[in-house]
A protein has these predicted regions:
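Helical element adjacent to the flavin cofactor pocket in flavoenzyme catalytic cores
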Residues: 235-293, 301
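Glycine-rich FAD pyrophosphate-binding loop
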Residues: 105-126
Length: 586
């Protein structure tokens, strides 16, 4: 479909949803640009989504204003040149760090820039950690292609980086409730759920070369006693994987660092300089980096980064997913991850489920809800109730009082609802790696290889290093060691014998290792992600003061200036004595 036809189709969408609103439409190179105003965020999303569904559309840039719209204030950058790089990667999530590691194989000066104080601080830290096989993705999409390939790469990479990864398997289950909210009569819905749906899944699996099998109701209930008696059938996917997304991201970054990549944390990009139609430099809060190539892996802010270069071809609309986390003891009641199919399916949402984590806890979720604020990681009472309502259909007898925490993460979706990975058609040297929502974790290794091919096609010379080392030695995890191994570790370092976090059996030695790591932990949450201190039943109620003390001692940062997860998240307002006596400086 050419630009003129796309413009006519887009105009009909606007007339349908915003007839009386001042909306301007233009189409360039199969990208739909929307400008003007609408009545609500829901209307903004609806128009963007329908434009994204148009056949042949590459992207949707939705600049429509709505009453709730927030303008993010950017910090001031520094023009002073602080160095040069062949490639600058914007974003320290799993995708950015995968690309950094892949580029570290070559004789290049690579700089990774991350606005947070640590890597894996966005979507990469708050997801269900599933390494999807590709069975749940729309056929023919870039998502599906890269998910299938990335899934096949995981075992080798996680072995090299000493990151936990298991193919625990997943049951995809249909029940008598699967078609309850449709107009299909009950007896017919049950027949479809029991016989037709499993057949469709198996046919799709065969096309993708995935080893999946049908499981009878009897076998399912024998293997998973917590599953509802209303279950009708299931399909088992034995290769469904699980990892720790933040440990994986940290390991990728550490290995990239060891192979020569410069990692700049707490550094925000505020502008991209373009000269004669090509990338010239990246302006950050720490200074300017001269470069000819920028890889935009900025997740929720990818459209803003593209805007800085005059290369915007999409808009990110955040989708929030809330998740409940259960105590490890209760989680032992479930043997494999479980997913329930409910119809009609919510568009662009796989449905979540009861997901086993690599550490043995169970997660219920995630949900999916459009939000306009890219920092909204709240969890509401309504979202918790929605989680219980949906997944109790699958495991009604599961002890719900075993919840120990809840959290939410944000998916960085474009309106075409597919990955947007290509060289900019407007600015030479600017590479889009945007719209990386689920299954981005699974696809990350394949995305990195794809980006490498794009860079090669754009003229970047890639000469392999002979000294590249793909291996990374992970820190010791004392709770996983045998008694003899523990004794040896404690003999070498007595701090491994001092328990700080009782719930997760984390020692002082492990916390010190995290603080002294190649990418050092400088916040309470950074230590939590590396060691699990504070992730147990008491959620840091016991160990938090001790973690703060160790962090202060090792870094020289006063305890009252220690942060939870970023520069504005101080845990304390000051020392109690000086506050009471009025001697505080501030």
């Amino acid at each position: 479909m050419n630009d003129r036809k796309l413009a006519r189709k887009a105009a009909s969408i606007v007339r349908k949803h915003a007839r009386d609103k001042p909306v301007h439409i233009r189409v360039e190179d199969r990208v739909v640009y929307l400008e003007g105003a609408v009545s609500s965020y829901e209307e903004y999303v609806r128009i963007g989504r329908e434009a994204g569904r148009l056949k042949g559309v590459r992207g949707v840039v939705n600049r429509l204003s709505f009453p709730e719209k927030m303008e993010r204030k950017r910090p001031v950058g520094k023009k002073e040149c602080i160095g040069e790089a062949d490639v600058v990667i914007v974003g320290g999530g799993v995708v950015g760090c995968s690309i950094a590691r892949e580029l570290s194989r070559y004789r290049l000066k690579v700089v990774l820039v991350e606005r947070a104080e640590d890597v894996a601080c966005g979507t990469s830290k708050a997801n269900n950690a599933m390494v999807h096989t590709g069975i749940g993705e729309k056929m023919g999409t870039l998502k599906q292609k890269l998910c299938v390939k990335g899934h096949q790469m995981y075992k080798k990479i996680t072995d090299e980086l000493q990151v936990p990864y298991e193919q625990q398997g997943l049951y995809i289950i249909t029940t008598r409730d699967s078609f309850a909210k449709t107009k299909i009569p009950g007896f017919l819905g049950n027949f479809i759920a029991k016989h037709i749906v499993p057949l469709i899944i198996l046919r799709r699996a065969k096309k993708l070369g995935l080893p999946m099998k049908r499981v009878s109701r009897k076998e399912l209930l024998e293997n998973e006693p917590q599953v509802t008696e209303r279950a009708l059938a299931a399909v088992y996917s034995p290769t469904y994987g699980i990892t720790c997304p933040y440990l994986f991201t940290i390991a990728l970054a550490e290995n990239a660092l060891a192979n020569g990549v410069e990692v700049m944390l707490d550094t925000e990009v505020v502008d991209i300089t373009v000269k004669d139609g090509a990338v010239s430099s990246v302006v950050t809060t720490r200074g300017t980096i001269d470069t000819s190539f920028v890889i935009n892996a900025a997740g929720l802010y990818a459209d803003e980064i593209a805007d800085m270069a005059g290369a915007r071809e999409y808009t990110i609309h955040p989708k929030k997913g809330a998740t409940l986390l259960f105590d490890r003891e209760a989680s032992a009641l479930i043997n494999r991850s479980l997913s329930i199919l409910l119809f009609p399916r919510t568009e662009h949402y796989k449905g979540g489920g009861l997901m086993k984590t690599i550490d043995g806890n169970l997660q219920w979720g995630p949900t999916m809800r459009e939000v306009f604020d890219p920092t909204d990681t709240s969890v509401t009472a309504e979202e918790i109730q929605a989680i219980f309502a949906r997944y109790s259909l699958l495991a009604p007898r599961f002890p719900k009082n075993a919840v120990i925490a809840y959290f939410s993460g944000l998916r960085a979706a474009t309106f075409t609802e597919d990955f947007f990975i290509e060289a900019s058609r407007r600015v030479k040297g600017f590479i889009h790696v945007a719209g990386i929502q689920s299954p981005g974790l699974a696809a990350a290794p394949a995305i990195a290889e794809m980006v490498l091919d794009i860079l090669r096609g754009e003229g970047l010379e890639l000469e392999r290093k002979t000294a590249f080392n793909p291996y990374r030695k992970g820190p010791p995890v004392i709770r996983h060691l045998s008694p003899a191994e523990r004794e040896r570790a404690i003999a070498e370092n007595p701090l491994y014998g001092k328990i700080v976090c009782r719930c997760e059996e984390v020692t002082e030695g492990e916390i010190v290792d995290a603080i002294r790591a190649p990418i050092p932990a400088r916040s309470v949450d950074a230590i939590k992600r590396r060691t699990r201190a504070g992730m147990g039943r008491c959620q840091g109620g016991f160990c938090l003061p001790r973690v703060v003390h160790i962090l202060s001692r090792e870094t020289g940062i006063p305890a009252e200036k220690i942060v939870k997860n970023g520069r504005d998240s101080h845990l304390f307002v000051g020392k109690a004595k000086c506050l009471l006596e009025g001697e505080c400086e501030n």
